[in-house]
Structures are given as C-alpha cells and as structure tokens.
Amino acid sequence: MSNSCDLTGHGWQNGNMVSHSNRKTKKRFMPNLQRVTVFSDVLKQKFRFKVSAKTIRTIDFKGGLDDFLRNTKNSKLSKSALVLKKRIMKKVSGDGTNDRKA
C-alpha cells in the first residue's frame, strides 16, 4: 500500500474516464501524496509522513498535528495514526500543562 496516505489511509480509486463521445475507459485515480515533516507540540518531536494534499490542508486548518489527531474520529485514521494519537492522548492526560485551548 505504497500509494496511500499515512494518516488517513486514503488510497487510489477506480473509475471511468468519459470522453466527449461518451466512451468510457478504465482509470485509476491516485491521491496527491507528499512527503512532509510535521512537529508535535505535545510530544516535542518531528514526524515524517507521506500524506495527501487534502490531509495537509486539514492539519493546517485544525491547528497542527496534535489537534488534527485529537479531533478526528478513530474510524477515519489509519493504524499508524491511531498509535500516534494514543501516545498524544496519554501525554496530555498525564500532564495538565498542555491544555492549549485555555
């Protein structure tokens, strides 16, 4: 699964390319994957991921990697993202000083 997002697990999709004359040919739609390094404020550590452009925009919108993982449902995250989310939640619950939305 090299063509999938490390955080959300979004991969390629199959579909049809439809011409002007309405001919249909099979097409594989690949996600726009980028290698990014993201910093976790809670863990004080950098993480390198291969993520889709949509996920990068969502991380920026949510306010960083920590808030993205905390506010995203577990069903929408990949297994590696769930492991990282668990580490972040454990660190936040054990240390009351990391409440960023005060």
From Swiss-Prot:
One of its GO terms (cellular component) is cytosolic large ribosomal subunit. Residues 1-27 are annotated as: Disordered. InterPro entries: Ribosomal_bL28, Ribosomal_bL28/bL31-like_sf, Ribosomal_bL28_bact-type, Ribosomal_bL28_sf. Pfam families: Ribosomal_L28 (PF00830). One of its GO terms (biological process) is translation. Belongs to the bacterial ribosomal protein bL28 family. NCBIfam families: L28. This is Large ribosomal subunit protein bL28. The gene is rpmB.
